[in-house]
Amino acid sequence: QKPDSFLMAEIYEEARYREYLQMGKMDALYHKVGLYDTLRDIICYGHSSDRIDFVQEPLRDIAPQMLHFLENHDEQRIASEGFAGEARYGLPAMTLTAHLSEAAVMLYFGQEVGEPAREHAGFAMPTRTSIFDYIGVPAHQGWVNGKRYDGGGLTPEQASLRDFYCRLLRLPIKGNFQNIHRYNREHTSYYNDKVYSFVREEKQRKWIIIVNFSREDTFGFDLQIPPVLR
């Protein structure tokens, strides 16, 4: 009756992803088990960026139907003490998850201004914005600014973060994914598993995306593009 409806499912059994898409007729699935969990482990525990390939490669045929995110109503806020501790530490992962494929990306309200969810709401505990309690979202309220919606209540850091998100999500990045991470791991001096790189290619336009997950270190290397992509 409503052909424009969009059906999204939470399913945490990777072996059943295609079943939900093909038989269940879902339009998209949360990419929680796999990409979100991997990126969280990289951010929080310094796990190897090589793991990204292991979770993405088996899903290439359904990648456009996997919904990417770093925050939602269930998960801890990036800026919370239970996750990264500061919103800026999530920016490399957000850059990657927003443009890794043709998949849609979800931005949870308040994420773009670094909401840390420190409030003791009652039923829910800090680190998550409660969906069970009547509770404010202070960073988001700073953007609302008394219904003026001009960001007048944001700190300079929050305003800068929001500007980053606005610019990131407006980038017209499209096209096929090309993995150059593995090639550089094998052929490039000083390239390591704290960074990740890939190419998005559409007709004559190529986007080269490189992210550095390390909180402390920067790395100098000459990124190489495989001959087949030149």
Please state what every model-predicted region is.
Residues 1-15, 208, 212:
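Acidic/aromatic-lined carbohydrate-recognition and catalytic surfaces
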Residues 4-8, 65-68, 105-106:
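Structural preference for beta-strand elements that scaffold enzyme active sites
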Residues 8-44, 116-126:
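Substrate-binding cleft/loops of secretory-pathway carbohydrate-active enzymes
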Residues 19, 41-64:
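Glycoside hydrolase catalytic-domain groove-lining segments
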Residues 50-52, 60-63, 72, 77-230:
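Loop/helix patches that line or flank the sugar-binding groove of alpha-linked glycan CAZymes
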